[in-house]
Amino acid sequence: MKDEHRHQILIDEEWKDLIGISSVVKILTNFSQAAYYGSRRALMGLGYDPKDAPEALKGFRNEVNRILTLNPEEQQKALKSAYTAHAKYAKDRAKKGTDSHEILNKWAQKCIEENEGKFLTTGSFLADEPKVQKFLELAIPHIGKDARIIASEKKSYSEELWLAGITDLIVETADGKIVILDFKDRPVIYENDLLQMGGYSFLFPTPISFVLGVPLEGKEARPWFAVDKLQEAFKGLLTAYKFLNQFK
């Protein structure tokens, strides 16, 4: 798959759309939670975080008083800024995640090209980058310091399930286990992330021993060993995705 055809496959000289694994997992969006985060960001845009103590209203009062001194056009802009604060936050987080993936991918490619896939640790290309150090800190307890990187940012597809995806990292441990790793620029790995890695496991002919989610702002990586259960759950999710998609 070429980059411009990331979720497509060439059949009879025609590009056919595949189903993106991340798109399947997105149907599990918790809308009540999303609404909470959206309204929280709006209030933060007005100087108040609901997570703060109830008496911590000075910033809110100051911001409201400031807005009241503006003309109607400026007031509208200020309120729109608060209204769209969550969208801007999400966009900034996505950009940050992309930057982290680029750093880790460059480092992983260097490991493959210059060190037979073994981890480059300190004093070498990008190895001293905070994101690389954080990855090593969280991942090594689960895969070992002698693990070997097989592939990074691996674009793959399953013609049987009509799926496509990009796997962050695939490694082989010293005792021969094949592991899928996924990075997230946040403090925790959620169940949705495990399901996403379960989807990736369909893209490779070699059996996957376990998956490992690595939260680059967290304290612990999250492994999952029952890959067959993840695959079973993901297939159910894929069925639901196809059902819902027919109404679009």
Question: What is the role of each PLM region?
Answer:
Residues 130-131, 154-248:
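Nucleic-acid nuclease catalytic cores
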Residues 1-163:
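Metal-dependent nuclease catalytic cores that hydrolyze phosphodiester bonds in DNA/RNA
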